[in-house]
Each structure stands twice: as structure tokens, then as C-alpha cells.
Amino acid sequence: MIESQVCIVGGGPAGMMLGYLLGRAGIDTCVLEKHADFLRDFRGDTVHPSTMQIMHELGLLQDFLQLPHSEIDQLRAEIGGRSVRIADFRHIPAACRYIAFMPQWDFLNFLAEKARRFSALRILMQTQVTALIEERGRVVGVEATTPGGALQVRAGLVIGCDGRSSAVRQAAGLKVQDLGSPIDVLWFRVSRQPGDPGQVLGRLGRDTMLITIDRSSYWQCAFVIAKGAIGQVHASGIEAFRRTVAGAADFLAGRVHELQSFDDLKLLSVSVDRLTTWCKPGLLCIGDCAHAMSPVGGVGINLAIQDAVATANLLAGKLQRGALTDRDLELVQQRRLFPVKVIQRMQVAVQDRVLKPAVSGAMRDLTPPWFLQLLDHSAWLRRWPAQLIGLGVRPEHVRSPGPV
């Protein structure tokens, strides 16, 4: 058995950042991650200026930017073959005025490496939580399995950071509000060549939507399909899928043969939801565990990081003093619910009004809507979506205690 002041379930962006911040504050914390490493492909890899600002405030940015990554300081989309400029990050008030693309495993390994210098923090890999321990209506720990057998972790506070398929929130019986999603996403990779066009994030055709992310030696691609349509894609065969991809991005036509079979594709079943209540006595949920986000805008990592920073800001001092109450847990939801609602509302609008018509073949007019045409023609207006996308709604800053 392990005893800890705080037990964080899940070593994703929210869990690792919160573990770092609590360990930095000298709070006895353990992070439980079910996998042996962070090497999961086709996870979110969009690092927004808001996240790099947090790295800057923690004194980690210089080392962080030594990791392999690519950068874009403007967002462009292609609609019916026409390139449209949407956002310009070069004027936002942040340490980094661009979006970085970095494999999530590099991001998490970096945080884990930096966090291990804090003696108050333990990171336990290959530790899968199977149940919550409750006594007299209060969560007091978790049960887990490890390669060495069963493990019990007792903690004054358990924090669920285990993502959209959270075992913690299911075990806790917390109510989920499903906002719906009409899409799923197929992730795959295709090699990149020197003569390829520059970064155009989205390519919208009459019945296709393809996202292409530059990962230096290859393109990480996301092909949007209608919710539940994976069976139809399989029935049509891999050759038909290759032709569709080539039609969506003609510069990939000579390389789609690299998709040998459907084993080269990974399905992301998109959901947009949030818990009606993020906590119960002894338990708090943050990140995707509290609010599953659509891939629209690539904001998942960054909202999770913002949740972690807000949680540390609100709770770390009280944890240091041994003065944390169950009412304090409610402050996290009160702080973070408004930004989550705003972003989810925007994501649902894009899904319903743009992506659903596109993938269902209902989009007849591929002329960019008037507001996108306005953005394309006004450099000043492009600063506003950059501010919203890059920094988010009511961005957090590090105010939790430093090393003790």
C-alpha cells in the first residue's frame, strides 16, 4: 500500500502538469499512468501559445523549445480550392506568438523528466486504476493493478485526469452531459517531401474534410467522416479511401499507396461532453475526464493544461497547510466551467454547420462564408481569432507556490 496526500490518476497533459505543479509546491503526490511509456501515436500534438506561456512562467520554455517541433504563426484553410487566411498569431501578448506542433509523447516525457527532480512527486507507470476506495461516502484512495500485482493507494484527494474514457468518472458515478458530435476522425500518416506545399491546416471539399499537420518527415492527417460511418469506409475498400484522400489533397496522390490497409488508420470516435459536477467528497475530475473536447481547433491539450494550472492555483496553498475542504474542490469547476462552455459551444457550431454538411455531401456552395472572406482581407481582424485560439478564454497563469 502507498499513502499520499494527492493521487493523480492519468499521466496525460492534465495529470503530468498538475503533478509537476504539486510536486514543485512540495505536496506529497503520486501520478498513476496505466501504460509503460507515453508513446501513443495520433494523440493531440497542437501546443498553443497559452501552454508555452505556462512553460515560460515555470522557466521551462527554453528547454522545451529544444524538442523537435514545427511552428506556424498564421492559420490558413483551403475551401473549394481557395486559400483563406483565418488567424494571425504574430501580435498576441504571449512569450511565443505561434502554434507549435510536437508529438504528445515528447511533451509528456519532457514534463516527466523535469518533474522527477521534485522529491515530493512519484510517477508510477504501468499502474492501472480499477476502482475507487470509498469510506462513509468519501473517496479515500484507489485500487490498481501493476506488473507486480495489486496495489492500493490511499490519498486525501484523488484527482481524475484519465481522459475521455475515464475509469475514475465511471467508478464515481458522476453524471455526464452529452453535447453530441456528428463526426468521427480517421488518423493516419503519409510521408512528406521537400516540394510539398506549406502548412494549410484544413482542406474542405464538397464531401471531404482533411486536416494535414506537418511533422517534418511526414504529414499527420485527420480525415473527417460522419459519425458511425467507419463501416461504410471499410466496405468501400482501402483503394477507394486512397482515391478520396488524393482528391482532397492532390499533392498526396503519389503517396497514398503508403496506406497499405485499414490497419494504418486509427479511428477517433469524437465525443463532446462534460460532467455536470466535477467533484464529490475526496475526488476531483479535470481535463478530458471532466469535459471531452472535439478535435476542432486542436485545443484539448491546452484546455487540460489550463485546468491543471487553475487546480494548482486554487488548491496547492491549502494542501500545503492541510486546510483543504470539499468546498474548495468546487472552486475548480467554478473557475474553469465558463471557458469550457465557450469553447465547446464553438466546437459544436463548427461541427454542425461546417463539418456535418461537408462529410454528408450536403454542402453545395463551397464559396467561403462572408465572415471568413472578411478575415482573409483584414490583417487586423485576424488578430481576434488568433487571440481566442491561441490564448483561449480567461487564460490561466502560474500562481501556485514554488519550490519549498
Predicted regions, residues:
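Beta1/beta-strand and adjacent pyrophosphate-binding region of the FAD-binding site
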Residues: I2-G12
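Conserved FAD-binding catalytic core of PHBH/FMO-like flavoproteins
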Residues: T127, G137-L151, L157-V270, R274, ...
